[in-house]
């Protein structure tokens, strides 16, 4: 059964600290509304901006709510990633994950393979690849993943479904998740294992229903809902999706997630107003379809 995994937003206070209470409220709501797992410290959670201590703080807070967690530990200091992986032994979670070391250009494939194999060697949990070429500048594709040989699963954040399907073709025992919100109906229809969908932070009901309809082979209904979801995603990108996520969660779910962390700045009042104006018609349609409540 395909899963919907939420790369959970990290709420910050005005003075730039993690707001653990808001994080727990958000995690509780997501699990209650049918989200299968939470991906902690991902891009949507502003993971690259978090210190190792903050990454662990996020894990502890979410673990108070659920153990259905994939704990993202990656970064530019391998010692930090190793330490976080080892510390995760105290938590009965699904697994750890890491993106490729980013920023540094022209890293050899040999060194990238060594990075991930080192994490696999020390991890007390299954290890998931977080492949996000646009953000990291490195594509740990299906062939490289097979060479590394120790991944339980992959989150492939790329719009090309063939690229994602290749992981399953070359690594048939690997759990393969698309990182694209716009491919939920497609993924549920192809035999892949689900989506890690940023939009499920603010529209968990929609993402879960798209998956359900696609699994029931109600493809027309699934696509109708998928296209409404896509419109919200596209609206968020106009103003910067990482900042928009905070506004949209408050609008659709009714609770405040505080602030993002600069250089991901909060939207100003006018940007918020314009964003809400772009999605309020979609919300009305979702209410009419009885996906959302009034």
UniProtKB/Swiss-Prot annotation:
Annotated disulfide bonds: none
Alphabetic keyword roster: Carbohydrate metabolism, Lyase, Schiff base
Pathway membership: Carbohydrate acid metabolism; 2-dehydro-3-deoxy-D-gluconate degradation; D-glyceraldehyde 3-phosphate and pyruvate from 2-dehydro-3-deoxy-D-gluconate: step 2/2
Coiled coil location: none
Catalytic activity, as annotated: 2-dehydro-3-deoxy-6-phospho-D-gluconate = D-glyceraldehyde 3-phosphate + pyruvate; 2-dehydro-3-deoxy-6-phospho-D-galactonate = D-glyceraldehyde 3-phosphate + pyruvate
CDD domains: KDG_aldolase
Enzyme kind, highest EC tier: lyase
UniProt xrefs under Pfam families: DHDPS
Temperature-dependence annotation: Extremely thermostable.
Marked site: Proton shuttle: 130
Catalytic site: 155 (schiff-base intermediate with substrate)
Record has Kinase as a keyword: no
GO molecular function: 2-dehydro-3-deoxy-6-phosphogalactonate aldolase activity; 2-dehydro-3-deoxy-phosphogluconate aldolase activity; 4-hydroxy-tetrahydrodipicolinate synthase activity
Enzyme Commission no: 4.1.2.55
Positions with a binding annotation for substrate: 43-44, 130-132, 155-157
Signal peptide start and end residues: none
Quaternary structure and partners: Homotetramer; dimer of dimers.
Other comments on record: The metabolic pathway in Sulfolobus species contrasts with the situation observed in other microorganisms where separate enzymes exist for the catabolism of the two sugars, glucose and galactose.
Similarity remark: Belongs to the DapA family. KDPG aldolase subfamily.
Function of the molecule: Involved in the degradation of glucose and galactose via the Entner-Doudoroff pathway. Catalyzes the reversible cleavage of 2-keto-3-deoxy-6-phosphogluconate (KDPG) and 2-keto-3-deoxygluconate (KDG) forming pyruvate and glyceraldehyde 3-phosphate or glyceraldehyde, respectively. It is also able to catalyze the reversible cleavage of 2-keto-3-deoxy-6-phosphogalactonate (KDPGal) and 2-keto-3-deoxygalactonate (KDGal). It is equally active with both D- and L-glyceraldehyde.
Protein's recorded name: 2-dehydro-3-deoxy-phosphogluconate/2-dehydro-3-deoxy-6-phosphogalactonate aldolase
Organism: Saccharolobus solfataricus (Sulfolobus solfataricus)
